[in-house]
Curated annotation (Swiss-Prot):
Gene Ontology BP terms: translation
Organism: Polynucleobacter necessarius subsp. necessarius (strain STIR1)
Gene Ontology annotations for the cellular component aspect, listed alphabetically: cytosolic large ribosomal subunit
Record keywords, A-Z: Methylation, Ribonucleoprotein, Ribosomal protein, RNA-binding, rRNA-binding
UniProt xrefs under PANTHER family: 60S RIBOSOMAL PROTEIN L12 (PTHR11661), LARGE RIBOSOMAL SUBUNIT PROTEIN UL11M (PTHR11661:SF1)
Name the record gives this protein: Large ribosomal subunit protein uL11
Amino acid sequence: MAKKIIGFIKLQIPAGKANPSPPVGPALGQRGLNIMEFCKAFNAQTQSMEPGLPIPVVITAFADKSFTFIMKTPPTTIMIKKAAKIEKGSPRPHTDKVGSITRAQAEEIAKAKMPDLTAADMDAAVRTIAGSARSMGITVEGF
């Protein structure tokens, strides 16, 4: 018989920097999970990634105090900002443009994000990424 699930915990943790301090410690502690075990497992799986890159993670907590976790791809906005080489998006996205990315860069981001997107095909995924970029005040060349 399958283990009884007592909850899901969604967090964004910097790659390689999970530690028992908030927000990780309290979120796992409330469910009675072993915080250090999660931190060690997460840091081991993210050591090959760029340090500090926020990684969304979904932790499934079971009734016997065990857990599993699934790591998602980094947020789209982080990838777009990195491609455009900017620190933050525009405070007024439709009037002030702060940078631009090419269609090739949008395709590269879409390829990386494809497992987490609901897009039916690659073209739809690229349009999704382009829309996110436009809402940040970044123009997409080739659209």
